[in-house]
Amino acid sequence: MSSVNLSSFIDMLRLGCNNIAKNYEYINQLNVFPVPDGDTGTNMKVTITEAIKKLENEKSHIKSFSELGKNFTRDLLLFSRGNSGVIFSQIMKGFFSNIIVNKTSNNSELSIEDVANAFIVAQEVAYKNVSKPVEGTMLTVARLISNEFKSQKNRPKTLEKLFEQAVKVAWQAVKKTPQMLPVLKASGVVDSGAYGFACFLEGMLSYYGGESNLDDNTLSTIEIKFNKFKEQHANEDEFGYCTEYVLRLGLKINQTVEKQKFHQKKFESKVNRIANSVVIASDKDNGFVKVHAHTLKPHLLLEMGLNYGEFEFVKIDNMNLQVNNKNNSPTKRVLKPAIVATVPTEAFAERIREDHDINAILCTDDTGAPSVFSLLEAVKLTNSSNVIFLLHDKNYFLSANETIKQLKHQKINADYVITANPVESIAALTVFNSDLSIHTNVKAMKRFIKEFASATITQASKSYKENKVMVNKNDFIAVTNKSIIASESQLTDCFFKTIDILSKKVKKPEFLLAYYGKDITEQDAKKMQALVEKKYKLFCEFSPGEQKVFSYIIGIQ
């Protein structure tokens, strides 16, 4: 087969998604520490599954590879989670970039040449859009596949053989990742993101094996949880009118009125000034535009459309009738800075809500790292034009950075503070002052974190050696700044040794904050607290964190 049609290629993308879904738990375990706490598999699974679900809903409206590329790459970025999800979205953005430009007609097919060139551009765009490309990751997989197809003589005669070759190179690249990243070699694992990308390509290849195996179960709904605040205020953005219409471009009822030439970007810019939840899809071949938006001024939205043509269909629903209509207009955004926080569990979220009256909180245990979409939705909940993202994992940086870029277009100022764990986040919140500026708050929070010492304690799943610390399987280990600082066969000994080390980093340590995980009972936590208070004369606070991986997350100040 020398080409592939649109429907078949969508099936190939879905098979790639399925293969990641089948392997995500194993991908999660390909982490560089002896604890299987990675979430690369979850992040990649959620990223592509949500994009494929959106694609399935829109499939009947997609008539060309160009439309497919625009929709799919857009949704990949919106739903991307963690570094792996964002980087994967950039690889696919590159893959579709030339296809979007060249394959705009209906019933077009992708040739061997199209796909080979797509793999080449995928690498170029991904490396360009990732600020600090690291070899030994999925970027390396994209680069080596690109190099393979740059030579015409390496291009097979069929698409099946081309994907076989791409998958072969991908797995070869995966095997090379430990040689490129010493931390992978020391741990005896390959890079999880590279493995996930290879799984995706292998899934696409399976289309040619004659077994589609399109399992609807892999596309089961994955809901983003915004905690109780989202439930209480789910309807705030629904005030106004849901306005939809189909506009036939250039059509004139009144022949004396001249119609303007339609420019989608300019039109979108105008619509976004008076509406949200905006979706505008144009079909230039058939000369019409579909518009969907939520606005308080539907008459203005209709007037905008009439500048370019006439309506074939109009539908306006009053959303106020479906919600509590005591407020008839949206609340203006406040100037005081607000916090959007990420935490691993509901227990941490509840603590932050109670102590700091912060409600825009995203729990990541079930959904993986926050996507750009989920962060944007959380910002809406703050109702503030000045926002600080408080992130408990540095792997969330790319999503936060992309969100900040998008918020600039909405005239919302945003910055971020990254902590090593949720205990550091809770500590940083003690110096947050909503009467001060974003800049002042971010500076104060970062300074406080530097004076705060924290670590996570868990049980090793394999033997390991790092620097001068020897870890045996099932040892309890303490980790800070991705370095193992203590390893003991008994949990109490590890806890004490961790306190000794952390106390040296803090001037006059007085207070210890500890959150215990699901593997620790309340009774055991109380016993540990009593032992610590007796030995160290520290004021201690032990609380349930309900985290899955870590027995304890502790901080000293």
Curated annotation (Swiss-Prot):
Q: What InterPro entries is this protein classified in? A: DegV_domain_contain (IPR050270), DhaL_dom (IPR004007), DhaL_dom_sf (IPR036117), FakA-like_C (IPR033470), FakA-like_M (IPR048394), YloV-like (IPR019986)
Q: Name one GO molecular function term.
A: glycerone kinase activity
| GO biological processes | glycerol metabolic process
Residues annotated as transmembrane: none
Signal peptide per UniProt: none
Pfam families found in the cross-reference section: Dak2, FakA-like_C, FakA-like_M
Span of domain DhaL: 7-206
Fetch the SUPFAM superfamilies from UniProt: DhaL-like (SSF101473)
Q: Which PANTHER family match?
A: DEGV DOMAIN-CONTAINING PROTEIN DR_1986-RELATED, PHOSPHATASE PROTEIN
- State what protein this is by name: Uncharacterized protein MG369
Annotated organism of origin: Mycoplasma genitalium (strain ATCC 33530 / DSM 19775 / NCTC 10195 / G37)
